[in-house]
Amino acid sequence: DENVFPMKHKKEWDGDKLFDSLYEALRTFLLANAIRDIRDVEKNTHRSMLINMSRFTKVQSVIMDIVQSHVDEVKRNVKQTHKFPKAYALTNPIIKDLKKTFDKQFSSFQYSLDGVTWDEVFAQLYDAISKIKIVVVNSGKNSSKLNYDDNKDGLRVIAVGGLALSRGLTLEGLMTSYFYRNTSTFDVLMQMGRWFGYREGYDDLCRIWLTKTSYSYYKYIYKSTEALTSDIRTMGLEKRNP
């Protein structure tokens, strides 16, 4: 429902809730952290989530506050229930939603060689998410700098931003991307496309939320890039110059 947060919103937007799909994306990122803690030998790795919904710095701060409130609520409920009997914990609506997200996004892992079950994830979840930070990254005075090098124990962060995230900024260990923006500008799309690269060792945990319009643009770019690559390869075989 675009009425919750219009695509063409104004800089004065000051709502108090966002899309259900964003909350689903947030739960996915939290769960992915727990899964990596279970699977990875190296625990001190950087893990990031990207949220790009507005070009207005004021609106980005509002979004950050909403995300902070939601994540704090999840942390609080996980802390209160993670030592309860599993069936009883699932009577908590927050935990029930986490289980639904796990079943939707990651349940197939239970049947893989390094299978991870819900019980394992829930037991690990609080430790995995307790140090996740939510920051806003933009040109404003309240912006945070993502100093990954200063966090030797691994920075776990949800970054909310706009243009700064679209052009040039690298998010280490990016696993979850939520992108509610439409742009048809080729170079901007290509720059943002690097978010979605192959992530060795955790590519199966990466998830992307896009609008249908953005998806169609990326599909077009993919086909164009593949055609160009094929043409260059053919010209090389024929000893021709581009």
Language-model features, listed with the residues they occupy:
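Catalytic or ion-translocation cores adjacent to nucleophile or general acid/base/metal-coordination motifs
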Residues: 1, 155, 170-242
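Flexible loop/turn segments at secondary-structure boundaries
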Residues: 57-60, 141-146, 166-167, 184-188, ...
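Catalytic micro-motifs at enzyme active sites that drive phosphoryl/nucleotidyl and oxygen chemistry
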Residues: 38, 147-148, 164-166, 195-196
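Short His-Asn-centered micro-motif
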Residues: 52-54, 137-138, 157-163, 179-182, ...
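Conserved C-terminal RecA-like helicase domain
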Residues: 42-158
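Conserved interdomain linker/interface between the two RecA-like ATPase lobes of SF2 helicase motors
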Residues: 1-66
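Generic, well-ordered alpha-helical scaffold segments in large soluble proteins
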Residues: 25-32, 36, 66-77, 101, ...
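Short, well-ordered loop/turn elements at secondary-structure boundaries
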Residues: 25, 43-46, 128-131, 151-156, ...
